[in-house]
């Protein structure tokens, strides 16, 4: 991955990463939009893939990933909401994805899917829906680069944050910190769904370090059409000293 490696979170403050979700971007101007979020200070491009099987919506595929890859230098963070998942992993890796995350319910063999992602040169993430238990991490956390906790039920952008997920964030943070303290690999803790300037501080305090925001970013452009203002406000609010 050519940017942004996992951070242990040690030190005076945890590293904060912002990952605008292009699901909320203007698709008629998608190239301009991804350039604008990078110029505005985004750390990742979050790329939601839905297949109308695992979730009841249909979005974008590898061709779109391939098209935006030359336009940005920041990593592309692909979230696969598809079933079955394994066939698409090589396609997105070839298209330029840097991180690929999937839902355990969409894989017949979770460990094998994690290995497939890593074999194709990408960072591997596991996505847990609001009702999916953290026990999925019992035998996978030491192989992951990213845990993505959904704070809405996946399928559509613009949903409200589910407050009950905060306790799950705290528990996941404790698991990651224990692994790192024991000499294990650092893992990003990403949150996706209803993240906004007025709740990101609370989410960061619970332990998240990587924040997916869709409508909160793309619905609040600067006067010049850029996103420096909202990304700065989100980063400031998420920075816990």
Curated annotation (Swiss-Prot):
GO molecular function: D-ribulose-phosphate 3-epimerase activity; metal ion binding
Superkingdom of origin: Bacteria
PROSITE patterns for this protein: RIBUL_P_3_EPIMER_1, RIBUL_P_3_EPIMER_2
Enzyme class: isomerase
Stretch forming the signal peptide: none
Listed pathway(s): Carbohydrate degradation
GO term, biological process aspect, one: pentose catabolic process
Chemical reaction(s) catalysed: D-ribulose 5-phosphate = D-xylulose 5-phosphate
Binding site for a divalent metal cation: 46, 48, 79, 192
Cofactor binding mode and count: Binds 1 divalent metal cation per subunit.
Sites where the protein binds substrate: 21, 79, 155-158, 192-194, 214-215
Cross-referenced InterPro entries: Aldolase_TIM, Ribul_P_3_epim, Ribul_P_3_epim-like, RibuloseP-bd_barrel
Catalytic site positions: 48 (proton acceptor), 192 (proton donor)
Keywords: Calvin cycle, Carbohydrate metabolism, Isomerase, Metal-binding, Plasmid
EC number: 5.1.3.1
Stated name of the protein: Ribulose-phosphate 3-epimerase 2
Family as reported in the entry's similarity comment: Belongs to the ribulose-phosphate 3-epimerase family.
Presence of the UniProt keyword Metal-binding in the record: yes
General function of this protein: Catalyzes the reversible epimerization of D-ribulose 5-phosphate to D-xylulose 5-phosphate.
Cofactor: a divalent metal cation
Native species: Cupriavidus necator (strain ATCC 17699 / DSM 428 / KCTC 22496 / NCIMB 10442 / H16 / Stanier 337) (Ralstonia eutropha)
Pfam families per UniProt: Ribul_P_3_epim (PF00834)
């Amino acid at each position: 991955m050519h940017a942004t490696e996992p951070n242990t979170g040690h030190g005076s403050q945890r590293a904060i990463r912002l990952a605008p979700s292009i699901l909320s971007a203007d698709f008629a101007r998608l190239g301009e939009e991804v350039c604008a979020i990078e110029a505005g200070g985004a750390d990742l491009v979050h790329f939601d893939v839905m297949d109308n099987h695992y979730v009841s919506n249909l979005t974008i595929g590898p061709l779109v990933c391939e098209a935006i890859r030359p336009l940005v230098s920041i990593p592309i963070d692909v979230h696969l909401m598809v079933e079955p998942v394994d066939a698409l992993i090589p396609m997105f890796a070839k298209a330029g994805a840097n991180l690929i995350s999937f839902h355990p319910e969409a894989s017949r063999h979770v460990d094998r899917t994690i290995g497939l992602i890593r074999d194709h040169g990408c960072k591997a993430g596991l996505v847990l829906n609001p009702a999916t238990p953290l026990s999925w991490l019992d035998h996978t956390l030491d192989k992951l680069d990213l845990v993505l906790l959904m704070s809405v039920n996946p399928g559509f952008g613009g949903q409200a944050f589910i407050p009950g997920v905060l306790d799950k964030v705290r528990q996941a943070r404790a698991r990651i910190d224990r692994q790192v303290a024991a000499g294990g690999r650092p893992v990003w803790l990403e949150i996706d769904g209803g993240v906004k300037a007025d709740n990101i501080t609370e989410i960061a305090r619970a332990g998240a370090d990587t924040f997916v925001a869709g409508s909160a970013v793309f619905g609040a452009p600067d006067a010049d059409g850029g996103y420096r203002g909202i990304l700065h406000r989100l980063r400031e609010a998420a920075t816990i000293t």
